[in-house]
Amino acid sequence: FNPILQYGVEDFCKKCNEIGIDGLIIPDLPIDYYEENYKSIFKKYEIYNMFLIAPQTSDERIKKIDSISDGFIYMVSSSSITGSKDSFSSEQLKYFERIEKMNLKTPRIIGFGVGNKETFEAAVKFSKGAIIGSAFIRNLHLNGIDSISKFIYSIKD
């Protein structure tokens, strides 16, 4: 969050709006600090701030995040590094089920560990979508830009 503070939060949000950015993930922006000091600025410039939750996040904190969110909630699938597995563990699936049962108002999107058809299908079973980061970059690096459509369809279809 420090680079945004140095730039100026309002100037940053204004610039984001001008160039077509409508959502941000700022992992080190504390939720209470955001709510008290910056939510109105983000709203003024129509910028969504996406908060992250993880398996260790308490139900109380998740409910707080849900109450102030207006974009989506980024469900981090595990505490491990991103792009590290080919399937979700039973513990991860229990976490997804726990969050689903909370009936949150804010859509959830699952990321970290989504990179093939199996993990994509599991993610969208419990959320509104999936974020495919590391696997996408790895495919791009190994197979080039012409492989992107094939990669996406191998997951989606």
Q: Which residues are covered by each model-predicted region?
A:
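Short, well-ordered coil/turn segments that N-cap beta-strands
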Residues: 20-22, 45-49, 70-71, 104-108, ...
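Catalytic cores of alpha/beta
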Residues: 57-68, 102-103, 110, 114-130
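Short beta-strand/loop segments at the ligand-binding rim of alpha/beta enzyme cores
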Residues: 1, 42-52, 100-113
